[in-house]
Amino acid sequence: MERYESLFAQLKERKEGAFVPFVTLRDPGIEQSLKIIDTLIEAGADALELGIPFSDPLADGPTIQNATLRAFAAGVTPAQCFEMLALIRQKHPTIPIGLLMYANLVFNKGIDEFYAQCEKVGVDSVLVADVPVEESAPFRQAALRHNVAPIFICPPNADDDLLRQIASYGRGYTYLLSRAGVTGAENRAALPLNHLVAKLKEYNAAPPLQGFGISAPDQVKAAIDAGAAGAISGSAIVKIIEQHINEPEKMLAALKVFVQPMKAATRS
């Protein structure tokens, strides 16, 4: 959890926002997946948001569902994902690593055991996409016992009650949703979200990162101008992986070309 605090403090000092890419672990296979993560960090990623493949990803649009299918085709298991997370942490000791996943994968292990494993491999946060705030107690309590930040989604239509709960229970960062629906770069982020950002700040919530539909530098800049601490981009990155699936070197070059201007847009 402390890695998020020190990241946001450093960025504030440098007058920058955070750029956070999302990818699915082991898409399209373990070696290339590790190279992808190294490339994202070299190109300027401030933190990582990583998906553990799940057979029924409700919040994901077709792009990320395809990434999940590719990972399954490569024979992915949650145990292998944790081995991979340990490797990433070893190589990148200071970058915050967040997991974005579904409740079944947490239950499979046993809630406490799952978060214990996260702590062991150096995961900083976990967002369980299909667990609403009001049902989150066993997850967030286990997370905090193991020094893992529980992350909550703040939807664009959040009422005051929900905003207070998110502020009270969340740690690390707050996932500020650009719009309702499933993930996807095709549906551009709807702005502005100034009123939500102001309320979250008022209630002392963890810094908001805006996600869903973030696919261009102007959207990153707009999110930060609206008061967000940064932006998360997933489908646009996963699409690049898909487009260059048979050209691993081209894929890495294209990812670099995408991430550099996205990071540059966080600088005021």
From Swiss-Prot:
InterPro entries: Aldolase_TIM, RibuloseP-bd_barrel, Trp_synthase_alpha_AS, Trp_synthase_suA. SUPFAM superfamilies: Ribulose-phoshate binding barrel. Its EC number is 4.2.1.20. The active site is at 49 (proton acceptor), 60 (proton acceptor). It is an enzyme of class 4 (lyase). It catalyses: (1S,2R)-1-C-(indol-3-yl)glycerol 3-phosphate + L-serine = D-glyceraldehyde 3-phosphate + L-tryptophan + H2O. Signal peptide: none annotated. One of its GO terms (cellular component) is cytosol. Keywords: Amino-acid biosynthesis, Aromatic amino acid biosynthesis, Lyase, Tryptophan biosynthesis. Pathway: Amino-acid biosynthesis; L-tryptophan biosynthesis; L-tryptophan from chorismate: step 5/5. Pfam families: Trp_syntA. PROSITE patterns: TRP_SYNTHASE_ALPHA. It comes from the Bacteria. The keyword Protease does not apply. GO terms for molecular function: tryptophan synthase activity. NCBIfam families: trpA (TIGR00262). The alpha subunit is responsible for the aldol cleavage of indoleglycerol phosphate to indole and glyceraldehyde 3-phosphate. Tetramer of two alpha and two beta chains. Belongs to the TrpA family. This is Tryptophan synthase alpha chain. It comes from Shigella boydii serotype 4 (strain Sb227). The lineage of its organism: Bacteria, Pseudomonadati, Pseudomonadota, Gammaproteobacteria, Enterobacterales.
